[in-house]
Amino acid sequence: MIVLRSRSPRRKYVLESLDLDFRIEPEDIDESSLKNEHPLEYLKRICLSKLGTRSKDEFLISCDTIVVQENSILQKPKNFLEAVEMLERLSGKTHKVASGLGIYYKGLERFAFEFSQVHFRSWNHKQIREYVEKYSPFDKAGSYGVQDKEGPVRSFDGSYTNILGFPIRTFFQYHEFWKKYLKGN
């Protein structure tokens, strides 16, 4: 059985849509960034840390998603004001989303990631506040969800599931590790 080290309902949804046999056992870690830490170094450190306690008999996966604008990491907002500030910073601009995948299987540890580009609508302060009030994006990097119908995303280049928080193309590269966990096998 696959062990997903995440509480994200979006990651759970992606694995369910693949019809995989898995259970959820999140690992609580400190997700603070280190001083002068490059976004991809941060992503790798967090993904591998989330793998947590390891047993050779388990197939563990962890993910983390970051929004990167002007080489700065935008994580999950801590409160309403921070969510509004992030969205104002992103409004009318293009930024990158990186989702990382940590894998532990039979003593092997792997890390890989995907980048996507997201193009935001130009929103005024009122539109941003209304969005935050309606969607409460406090569990999402960058303070938004690509899946939100009335959200700030105008368009994107790359993988929808990557922006959602699960780098599915990268996950498929490791299919030899997880294909035996497909339901019905």
From Swiss-Prot:
Its EC number is 3.6.1.9. Keywords: Cytoplasm, Hydrolase, Nucleotide metabolism. GO terms for molecular function: dTTP diphosphatase activity; UTP diphosphatase activity. It is an enzyme of class 3 (hydrolase). Its cofactor is a divalent metal cation. Transmembrane segments: none annotated. The active site is at 64 (proton acceptor). It catalyses: dTTP + H2O = dTMP + diphosphate + H(+); UTP + H2O = UMP + diphosphate + H(+). GO terms for biological process: nucleotide metabolic process. Pfam families: Maf. The record marks 10, 65, 147 as: Important for substrate specificity. Disulfide bonds: none annotated. It is found in: Cytoplasm. InterPro entries: ITPase-like_fam, Maf-like. Gene3D superfamilies: 3.90.950.10. GO terms for cellular component: cytoplasm. It comes from the Bacteria. The keyword Cytoplasm applies. The keyword Electron transport does not apply. HAMAP family: Maf. Nucleoside triphosphate pyrophosphatase that hydrolyzes dTTP and UTP. May have a dual role in cell division arrest and in preventing the incorporation of modified nucleotides into cellular nucleic acids. Belongs to the Maf family. YhdE subfamily. This is dTTP/UTP pyrophosphatase. The lineage of its organism: Bacteria, Pseudomonadati, Spirochaetota, Spirochaetia, Leptospirales.
